[in-house]
Amino acid sequence: MSRIVEDTQRVPATLAGARLDQAAAELFSDYSRERLKAWINAGELTVDGVQAKPKAKLHGDEVLALQATIEDDTRFEAQDIALDVVYEDDTVMVINKAAGMVVHPAAGNPDGTLLNALLHHHSALAEVPRAGIVHRLDKDTTGLMMVAKTVPAQTALVAQLQARSVSRQYDAVVIGKPVSGNTIDAPIGRHPKDRKRQAVTTSGKPAVTHFRVVERFRAHTHVRCKLETGRTHQIRVHMAHARYPLIGDPLYGGRAKLPPGAAEPLKEILREFPRQALHARKLIFKHPVSGESMMFQVDLPDDLLMLLDYLREDSETMR
C-alpha cells in the first residue's frame, strides 16, 4: 500500500549553514532521517525546485519541497498476537512483554515477534522504523517496554535513552548471597569466542548496573537492578561477572545450586527453571509530547512468584 505526501518548508535563518539532510530532519520531523535521505537522493525532496545532495549546505530562506510516495514497510507481516498493553495514547505505548516473545524478526525467528504483533495492533506503525521499538528485552525476559507510535516520538524516546534519563528497574533471582548491594561498572562487548554471548572486556562499551538486595534465601538472592546503560544482556553479564549468575540463564548461569537438604519440589524448579529469572518491573520516562513524567510498574509473572515462594518456604523450613 502506498500514498503520496506533499509538503513545503522554508529554511529558517537558524538552519543557515546546515546540511540539507540535517535541515530536512528538523523541518520534516514526521519522517525518519533514513527515509528523508532516500527522498533527497531520488529527487523527491528538492531545494528551490532543484535536486541536491544530502550534504549540500543551505544558506537560509531556500524552499524545500517534498513530493514523494510512501511505501508501507511490508517486509514484515502483521500478525494477530496477543499483547499486554499497560498504557497507550496517540504517540506512545507501554507493553508488558511475555516470556518467549522475540522482539524483532531475525534469523531463526522470522515472525511471531513483538514487531509482528505491533503491526497488527496499530497498522500505522508500518511507517515508523522498527515499528516504533526503541529498546529491547531478551526473548525470555519479561516486563515493561516502551514503543513509539510516531517518528517524532521515537526520536524523542531514543534521545532520552541516550541521555540516560530513562529509569529502568529489573527484578532478578540470582545464585549466591551478595553481602549487600553494589554498582558494577564494567565494559561489555561481544565474547571473543562465542558470538551468541557477551562478556566483560576492556574493548567493550561502557556499562553500569546498580543492584540492591530485596530478599535473601539459603543459597539464592532476590535482587533489584537499575540500569544506567543498555548493553545487550547487560544484567545477565554483569551479575555473572560478579559471581551471582541468574537462575535459569542458559548462557551465563552455570549449574543449578541446590541448598543442602532442599525438598524435591525446590530441587526440580531450580534444575528446570525454563528461562533467566529476570523481569523488567519499573519504567520511568518523559512523555515525548507533553514532557510529563510517566511511571509504570508491573508485578512479577507467575513463574517468578512461584520460584520465590519455593525459595522462601525452604529458608523458613530449614532455619
Regions found by a protein language model. Give the residues of each.
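RNA pseudouridine synthases
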Residues: 2-319
